[in-house]
Each structure stands twice: as structure tokens, then as C-alpha cells.
Amino acid sequence: MPVRPDLQQLEKCIDDALRKNDFKPLLALLQIDICEDVKIKCSKQFLRKLDDLICRELNKKDIQTVSSILISIGRCSKNIFILGQAGLQTMIKQGLVQKMVSWFENSKEIILNQQQSKDEAVMNMIEDLFDLLMVIYDISDEGKNQVLESFIPQICALVIDSRVNFCIQQEALKKMNLMLDRIPQDANKILSNQEMLTLMSNMGERILDVGDYELQVGIVEALCRMTTEKRRQELAYEWFSMDFIANAFKEIKDCEFETDCRIFLNLVNGILGDKRRVYTFPCLSAFLGKYELQIPSDEKLEEFWIDFNLGSHTLSFYIAGDEEDHQWEAVTVPEEKVQMYNIEVRESKKLLTLTLKNIVKISKKEGKELLFYFDESLEITNVTKKVFGGNKYKEFTRKQGISVAKTSIHVLFDASGSQILVPESQPSPVKENLIHLKEKSDIQKKLVNPLELGNSSSQDEITTPSRKKMSEASMIVPDTDRYTVRSPILLINTSTPRRSREPLQAINSVEKAVSKTSESGMDYAASPKSRQSDGRKRWNNRANHNKTTAVIQNKQYEDNESPDQNFNEIEDTLSNVSSAVGKVDKPVLPGVLDISKNTTHSRWACWTPVTTIKLCNNQRSRALPGDTCTQDTGVNKKCTKQKSVSDDDSEETQKGKYSKDVIKCNKSDEAEFCERNIQEQNHPKYSQKKNTANAKKSDWHIESETTYKSVLLNKTTEESLIYKKTCVLSKDVNTTICDKSPSRKSKRNHTKSRKELMSELTSCELEEIPVRENSKGKRFTGASESLINQISRRYNPSDSMMSTRKLKEPQDGSGFSKKPDLQFNKVQRKSYRKLKATVVNVTSECPLDDVYNFSLNGADEPVIKLGIQEFQATTREASMDNSLKLVKNHDEHDPFLKTKDKRMLSYEKKTLLSDTETECGCDDSKTDISWLKEPKTKRLMDYSRNKNTTKYKSRKSRSSMEKGQPRPTMVLNKNSMKNDYEVVVDGRTRLPRRATKTKKNYKDLSTSESESESEKECSYLFKDKLPTKEETIHSRAQTKKLPEKQQKVFNSEALKGQPSEEQKNSSRLREGREDSLCLSSASVSRSSSSVEVMRCTEKITERDFTQDYDYITKSLSPYPKAPSPEFLNGNNSVVGRGQSPRISETSAMCVRKSYSPASGPPFSPRHTPTKNNSVVNMKKANSVINNQRTQHCNSYSDVSSNSSEKLYMEPESPESCDNHMQNKREGNHAASPLSLSSEKIEKMWFDMPSENTHVSGPSQRGSKRRMYLEDDELSNSNEAEVEEAEEREHLLSKKRCQWENSDQHTFKTSLSTPDFSVPKDWQQELQGAGMFYDNISSDYKRKTDSQHKIMDDFTTKTLKLTQQHLMAMTSQAQGRRDENVEKFQVTLLDELEKVEKDSQTLRDLEKELVDIEEKLVQKMRAYHRCERERFRVLKTSLDKSFLVYNSVYEESVFTSEMCLMKANMKMLQDKLLKEMHEEEVLNIRRGLQSLFKAHEGNDA
């Protein structure tokens, strides 16, 4: 416990606070109870010290300290004495009131700085100041006069100032009215001066706009108290400009003040109309919980008035007080005390319910809810919202998600909290689209009929901007500013009439609802009317249906890659995609920041599987907290789902609609340009960009519209594709950086880097898009030009790279076509994986003359950028482009497949899953050629999320393969297989195939399904031998951000798997192989660390996508219908020879995907060897045997991709491990130059990779394959191998290319279907296998050795570098420690010196204490002596004065007095007796006389 300070030390406490800034004694003084009889003595300087202290603290704005000082003075004021006189009176004479005026003025400055903010500390300080003022006011008449004269004007000025908080003004008015109530008679003259008259007039004006009823009452009361009733009649007209108000004021009587004041103020507030700040409504009844509140008992009070104070944001009313003295009790409910309020109608009464945050007590009644019943006709809703805010309104509390409905509906809240339902395309301002919740439910009902909704809901309730109708009928409404702007825009997803999508899960208002697209491709939600909101920044040309939606972020439009993306694919596909893009672009809403891409998405989204969309939506909802772009993506994905559902049936219809919306382009590269141009035309800005792009280069890789759409879907899953390039650049750019680094190293990778750059540029463009259309258009143009330049640079490999890749240049284009598909598939997976940003760029530099001839489109390699992790997806885009080309050619060969392929291609473009699904596989020859030509281009595929991306992409690849009609991606993969080098380089795109193999059913991935099935078959065959490669691929899928070199290596490996066309172009393939080998070695080294991840991913992906892609292929892909039946029948189903090329293509795509950089990074060392083996196989693909082996490798890669996906999806099973071991053994035995059996050949292939591999590649590959097979074909592994051998022989006899494809199928089929047969001729085709094997083995060994050297060098340098850093770190740390020790030593010495000084001080004090002690002892002795002498004198005096003498004297006196008293008493006794005797004698005499007289009378 602290020492209790003496109350006499008040002045000392003030001194300590003033001089030492020590307030502890003063604060301790506040804890002491002060008795009334205690006197606190202070000096004359006390007031000066007090004033200095308070002024200093006020200048410092130390509110708490000032409040403590005022409380201390107030408590001790009556006990302070200065020079023996009352302290307060003395201080008043010294000028205390004047000093308090200065305190008040300083306090007012603080109050004005606070303005209307409510600061409890300031309010407490003002209250303490007024309390002290009232003490002074009551102390004496002099104090009253000074206070009235000094403070009444100050308080009036405070009340007039509108900047002061209402609570402070109310407190000041209360104190002033108390003063005026006890004003002396002679003080009225103080209130009669001109200054006060002016202030009173201003106070009268203040009544009109004060905004608080209590304050109004206080002002009226002050005016009445400051003037007499007679004078009030005169001044009323000066105070109020309107006569009827002045007359009403004059009617106020002091005896009826409360009721008269109510009448007056109701009149004043009512006259102001809408400008009034206080709304007063009569209340029928009021309750606090279950207790009813009574109206004050006053005859003149007719109503129970409730005041809604807009100025102070409070609700106030008066009730009957419990005590008889107080008939009126004021109750005020501030806004901060209200947790929620609700207004509803009950029994023809309007009930206002206020739910308070804490339990309150009113008139001894407690409760937490205040209930007010009003007449139903009173409009209190708006007023209540103005007082308590719209956010606390129970009915309109912001919802975290949208109610479930067939169509996604966004419920947005405007600033007032009102709900608004807005269709996706709705551009109208927030205020214009207010819709009640009931209307929301109605709209949801209307969504069942999209047409009706588009016509009625969009037009009647909400003015929707005119926008291009999309065959998908998907509307994308980017609402990135939804929360920031609180735009009441509700995205209405129109559901297709054919397939009503099950209710969407609740989507956060931040999330963008995905509009469902009808199979017919109609955008029902879009209304023909276009409406531009000036409040919201929109494109001026929104009315133009061809415009693409742009994402406005931070009031800036960001360029979307989709508008810029241009498909090199089939004309129909282009037209479909472009139309879809154009339509989707229109839906941009004024409040939406992020999506110009949405337009492209809608169609892509339609291609996206329904399951995928849901996943994207959910993921997106989680990722959406900040990204509206993600919302838009979600919308696109939903559309994609719808479209994918109706993919097979309405594909053609949608395509036709797209073509209607978008100008159709030729099948040539110009078609791609046209498509992009159409997209640009759809959006003026895009049109500008298109023109620039076309002028710059007709062959520059344009982002595929479809690809972009699928990217948007992916973006929906994560976050918006171009959310200020925060998402895209953060992940995609990072991926791009990873990819770019390899691309810079090799021009081959240059394509991938270019694609990445395209995605980056696109994201940048999206960010940079100005809010205004003109600026945005310019930026689109600039962005498109830059993209074109970047793409052209990437497609133009360096001279050194050109030597090896020029031959493959056309193949590279097709390789990119394949890549895009793979990337596209990956993109969809990424969307499942919640990819934050996905950019899909599809570019083609070579014509699309031959579906399988990528040489035609070698330069036109579609680039698909998956912005989630990297723009490596760009490589896939290239693959996609090639695949699209292949599909186109294949469609030419097979009209049915062509039509479906086109639809699927458009879908694939949108979905990014259709790359492998395109039916280019029909033309084996073309596929072979395209594969051979395309391999040069490296695929930029980014799988930011390995697991999801891998699954999803693999799924698509498999589906396309199974169908035997690989989608553009499939074709690209085939071509890549044939173009061993480049396609394998694009192997990253293979990763989606692995994912396709995984057993996830994505209905929209129909194309992917066929591819994935084909991949499965091939992967099964190769799985035993190439599991390692699959793992490698899968690991890449996980890593997703492999450098371009690795990606190229994988792509080249995949291309190796395509021997038929490679045999034709053996020389070019060899060159490509060399390049790919170099890349593969690099990628192997890099990806080796991620092998285990790949395995898990493979497993998981394999399972999920194996199941899902089949389902998806059946449901969505029209292509799979022809070849898919075989694939769809089961992974074990046998694929026909005609389908074998497709299968091989699919396998190739799978291989690409497996080799995709995304899968590459996760590779473990064993995966790396597989990768190298693939590369070696690619190199040897130049020869027929090489081509065949390359085909096997491709099949293996497909299998490996699938198995890698499987590994990713599920842990390796013992069976898979066993199969793997068997495969390794078989592969090792198969190392023999030629083998009569297909099994032996496969073994040779795998053995060769194993030899080239650092680790036993064949066994590793086999294990991967086994992993993939373990679900479907572990039991049939031997039969599968036999069948594989047979099928290989048969396919080789038919056609090496077809044979390779069939081999892939055979592998896959053998794994999946033991009943597949292979021709006996097959062995004859492999006569050159030994030579091919030797070449591959030597090349691979050389590469392996070089890699080992590089790794050794890297290890040595790393060790040295690490040692250097460790030494530097150690030295720095030691130096730091030494410095700290020295500092500590210095500090320690200083403290020791101080200790010595303190010790000396203590010794001196001790001496002083000894001296003092001696003096005290002497003084005490002297005192004792004096005391003893005093006692002696007193005793002597006492003895002399009393004792014997007194007793004797008193005894004599007593005796004499007693004798005298006795004598006197005897004399008195004698006298009395004598008188008594005489009286008796007299009485007897009288009696005798009367007796004698009576006797004498009788006798007479």
C-alpha cells in the first residue's frame, strides 16, 4: 500500500505535478475521503500554481490529467483555507473565475477539434469543469455574479456552434439552466446587455436546425429563463423571423412548460418539412421488454411522442417518472447502443423493435428490447434508417451468400442497406435497381425461364445494358466493386431451358454469380436495351453487342487476354468462340472492376464441366474475399458448366450462335486472327487491339477466346484472372518468370516465355485498361501490339535453336496447339484447384492445312497461359492451337467428328480441357505429320496447383484419347507425338492428360474425357515402362512452373512418343530430339525433386479423372461419341486402328501433359530419368524405329501422365509398385535391339529410357504406369503387355504413325483391356529399334553425364557459396556480439560508479543520523529534568494547601451551624404549636356559643 499523503499536502501535490510532472501524489489524494471539518491550508500562491498546471496540461491536450486536477480541487474546495480564510472566496477575489474562463476557452479548442466525434474523456473533462463552476456559483453572491457575467455568454456561444458535439451542448445547457434557476434578482441586468440579446437571437435560430429534441428543449428553456414573460413577448419577434413561430413561442407558459414546449417544437419541426432534423411521431404504446412504459401524467399531453433525432442519431421520448417529484423522465437511445432494429406490421400496427446491445434500466424496469407501436399509416422506416443506419436494419443485414436458386443471383446492398437484384448484364446504377427481397425470390422463379427473365426481370425491374447475345446464354457480370461501391447489382444467371442446373450454392455477394447459358446459346438475362451509368465507369459503347466485357479495377479497365486471344483452330470453332466472346464481353457492369475476360469465359465456361464450375464457385467464394475478378470467373465457369452439360447436343447450336455473334474466320491462321479480331470488334478496345495485332503480325499468337474463357473459369475458381494483375501477375507472372528464364536460355522455350509474356501483358493490359472506353481502346491496342511482338519473338527461336527447331517449326505450331489443349485442361483443373489467375493464350503461326501437319501451323502455336502459377500454360496454349489445327484437319476428314470437334474445340478453347479431346486423331497421317512438325515449339504450361490442375487436365486428355478423337489439344498432342521433339517439349500440356486419367467426372470435359481415355490406354501400355515419366509429368503438373527448358524437354519427349510422322521427318526429329534432350536434361535435373509429389498427384489424378473424364466425355464432348464409345466403354476398352492415331495423339497429348513443365518440377530423380528417356526417345524418333519408340514414349508419357495424375490423386498401391518392378524388369529385358513381341519392344523402349535415366527409368516408368494401372489394370498387366505387343505389331504393319497411336492405345488398352489384339507385322516395323535404342542410349548417357557434371559443379559452387555466406554470417554475428559486450561493459562500469556515489551518500547520511541522534538524546535528557522539577513543585504546593488544616476548620463551622439550625427550628416549632393551640381554642369557643344560642332559641 502506498503511503497515504497528508491532506495538508494538497499544495505540495500541485507543486510536484507542476515542477516534477509527478501526478502520483495528486492521484493518491483522490483516494482519500475528505471530512467536512478538515482544513487544508494553502498559500497565496496556490491559485497561480493551479492555473499554471491546468493551462500546461490543456496545451498538451492531456485530458485525463486536467480532469483529475479539476476533480481534486472540486472535492477539496470547501476545505481549503488561505491565510485563515475560506479558500474559494479568497481565490474568487484573486481571479479564479477569470482563470476558469481561460480554461474553458482552451477546452473549447479541443472540443472543436473533436467536432461531432464522441470522446468520453473530453465530455468528462467538460463535466468536471462545470461541476467546479457550480461549486463556485453556490459559494457566494460574488461568485454567482462573476460566473453569470463570464460564463453565460461562453455557454451560449458553445450551444450556437454547430461543430460542437450534441452531448457537450446538452451538458452545458443543463448547467446554464441550473444557474439561471438560482439567479439573484439584481443579476438580471447582466442578461440585458446587447451581447446577450444577440446571443439569444442566435439561439432562437439554432432551434430550427439543431437536430436533437433534447437540445431544442434546453435552448427554449434557457431563453425562457433568461427573460421574463413580459420581455419574452417583445423579444420573440426578434428571435424568430416567422410571426406564427414567434406567436407560438409566446404561448409557452412557465407553469406548463413541458407541454407548451412540445406544442411549439412540433410546430417548428413540422414547418421545416423534409429539411427538418427532428421527426416526431405519436406512439400508440411502448414497451421495455415485457414492461409497458407509461406516458407522463399531464392533462395537456395528448400523445406519447417519440422523437427521431437525425442530428445526434438518437431516439428520445418522455415517460412518467417513478418519483412524485419528477413527473417527466427523459429517455434517450443513442445509435451506438442499438444492435439491431426491425420494422414490421402487426395487427394493423407498425412495430418498431430496437434490440439493444446491453440490458438497460428505465424507471426501475430492465430489458434489452424497446418496442414501439405506431399507426400503420406512419412512414417511419426511412427516418429510422437515417437515425440508426441501414446496416442495423434486420431485414436488410448484409448476406454472406446468395440464396440457392436455379440461377445465381447476387444480392447487393447499397449504402442505405437496401437490397437490389441485378442481372449479370445489368449496368444500371445502384439506386436504379432497388428490388425487395420478395422481388428477389420472384426473380429466382423467373430464372427458371431464362427468356422470360431476360425480357421481364432484366428489362422491367432492372435496366440491363444491351449486350451481345451469346449462344451460351451465359452472362458475366464483373462486380469487383461490389463491396467497395456497394453497387446493388445482382448477377442473374439464366439457366438453359434444356437443362436446369441444380441450385447454385450460396455465393458471397463478393462472388460473381455465374450466369447459366442455355444450350441454345441465348443469353436470356441480357436485355436488348443498353443502359450506361454515368455514376459507374463503363465503356461508352456497351450498347455494342460485339464489345467484350472489361474488368474495371480501381476505376481502371484491365485488358483481358480473352478478347485478344485468337484461335488458330477450326473456322467453326473460331466463329463459335468469337461469338461467345463477344457476347460475354458485353455483360460488364458499371461497378465491376475485373472482367473483360468474362465475355470470353462465358462460352469457355460453357465448356467447363458443371462439377468443375461448382468447385470453382466454391473455391472462388473462399478466394473471393477481395477479388471480384474471381467472381466474374465464377460466373464464366457456371456458364461453362451449363454449356458443358449441353455440350454434346447444343454444341453445334451454340457454335452457330457464336458464329452469328462473331464474324466467321477462315480455317487458316487468318481465321484465328479473325476470331480475335471479331472478339476485338465485339469490344471496341479489343477491335483496336485486333487491328494492331493483325497489322503487326497475322501469325502472332493470339490468346484463344475459348482458352481465355476456360482461363476465366479457372480464374473463378481462384480469383479473377486479371485482378489488377495481382492474381495473374503474382502467380502467372511468377510462372512466366520461371518459364521465361528457360525460354531466354533457349529460343525453344522462347515460345513458352512469349506465351507467358502474353499472359503477363494481358494481365497488365487488364490492369491498365482505363475506365474510359477511348483510353481503354488505346491501351488494348498497345497491349495487343506488345503481345503480338512478344509472341512473335517467342515463336522466332534463336539461331542456335532455330537450327534444330526450324525443321520442326510447323510442328511447333501444332505442338502449341496441343499444348493449349493440355494447358486448357490444366487450366480447368486449376480452376478446380482454385487457381487465382489463369491466362490462356492461343496463338498459331503456321496455317492449319493439315490437322496432323503442324508444320503448316508451326508458327501458329496456340499459347495457353494458366495464370495461376505461371504463364507456362502458354506452352499449352500453343499445344492447344496445334490441337485445334489438327482438329480442324481431322474434322475435314471426318465431317461428323469435325462438327463435334469444332463445337468441342470452341468448348475446349473456353474450357482449356478440349485440347486433347479434339478429333484430329481421325487422320493418323495428319496427326503424325503435325506431331513431327510441331514438337519444336515448347509449351508454356503452368499448373499453379499441381493436384487439381493435373487431375483436370489429365482427365480431358484421357477423355479425348479414349474417344479416339483427340480435341485440338489431342491433335496437337498427336502431332506433338509425331513431332517428337517439340511435342514432348510441350509435354507440359500432357499434365492435363494425367489429370484426365484421374477419376474425376467433369461433364464439361467431354473432349478431355476422350483424350484422357486414350491417354489411359496408351498410359497403360507405357505405364509399365514409363511410369517414371508419368510421375515426372505429374510432378511437373504439381510444380506447374517448370522453366521453359524443362517444359520443352517434356514436350520433346512427348513428341518422341509419336514415331509415325517422326520417321518421315527423322532428320528434323533428331534435331528436335537433341534440343528436347538438352531441355529434358535440364528439366530432369530440376524436376527430380518433385517426383514423390508427382506420384501422389498421379494417383489421385488418375483415379479422379479416370472416372470423371469418361463421364464428361460422354456428356459433353461430341467427339467422343464416335471414338469415345470405345474409350468410354472403359479404360480397358480396345481402340480401333482408325482410332489408334487419335489414341496416339491423345497419348502424345498425355505425354505432353506428362512432360508439361507443370508436371516436370515435381519429378523425383526417377522421374527425371524417365524424362531424359523420353527425350532420348524423341531424338531417335527421327528413324522409323525412333518414331515407333517415340510413339511408345508418347503412349508411355500419356500413361505416365495418367499414372502421375493417379499418383498425385492416390498413394502408390503395392500392386502398382509390383507392376512397376515388373515393367522395369521387362523394360530392361526389352533393351534388346528388336523384339518379336510387342511386350519386348515396349520393354526395349522402357529399357532404353531406363539406361538413359539416372535411375532405372523403365522400372520407374513402369511403376508409374502400374500406379495408374493399379486401379484399372493391375490384374491384367501381363495380358495388357501381351496385347500391347500384339497391337504394336498390328499398328506398325498398318502404319507406323497409326501403329504408334495404336501402340499407345495398345498399351493403354492392354492395360485397360486385355482382349486387344496387335498385328504380327508389328515386329517387322521395329527392325531399326536396336539402332534407335543405341542412339537414344548414347544421347541419353551423354546428356546424363553432362547433367551429372553440371550438378557436381553446381554442388561445388553451392558449397563454396554457402561457406562464404556462413563465414560472413559468423563474422558479422561475432562482431555484433563483441560490440554488445563492449557496450554492456561500459554500462556496467557506469553503474558501478553510480553505486559508489550512492554508497558515499548513504555513509554521509548515516553520519548525519548519528549526530542527530546525539542531539536528540541531549534534548530528551533536559526535558526529563524539567519534568521532574515540575512534579516536585506541584507536590509541595499541594501538600501545603490541603490535608489537616482544611478538615479541622470545616468541622468547627459545621458544628456551629448545626447548633444554630437546631435552635431556630425549635423556636419555629414553638411558634407553630402556639398558633395551633390558639386556633383550636377559638374554634371551641365559637362552637359553644352557637350551641348556646340554638338552645336559647328553642327555649324561647
UniProtKB/Swiss-Prot annotation:
Residue stretches of biased makeup (Basic and acidic residues): 977-989, 1059-1076, 1217-1228
UniProt cross-references to InterPro entries, sorted A to Z: SYCP2-like (IPR024835), SYCP2_ARLD (IPR041322), SYCP2_SLD (IPR040560)
Hydrolase is among the record's keywords: no
Any one GO CC term of the record: lateral element
Phosphothreonine found at: T464, T496, T608, T633, T916, T1168, T1313
Main location as per UniProt: nucleus
Subcellular location: Nucleus; Chromosome
Composition bias, Basic residues: 948-958, 990-1000
Tissues in which the protein is found: Detected in testis and spermatocytes (at protein level).
UniProt keyword annotations, A-Z: Cell cycle, Cell division, Chromosome, Coiled coil, DNA-binding, Meiosis, Nucleus, Phosphoprotein
Origin superkingdom: Eukaryota
GO molecular function, one term: DNA binding
Post-translational modification: Phosphorylated.
GO biological process per UniProt: animal organ morphogenesis; apoptotic process; cell division; ectopic germ cell programmed cell death; female meiotic nuclear division; fertilization; male genitalia morphogenesis; male meiotic nuclear division
Family label: Belongs to the SYCP2 family.
Record's protein name: Synaptonemal complex protein 2
Origin organism lineage: Eukaryota, Metazoa, Chordata, Craniata, Vertebrata
Chain's gene name: Sycp2
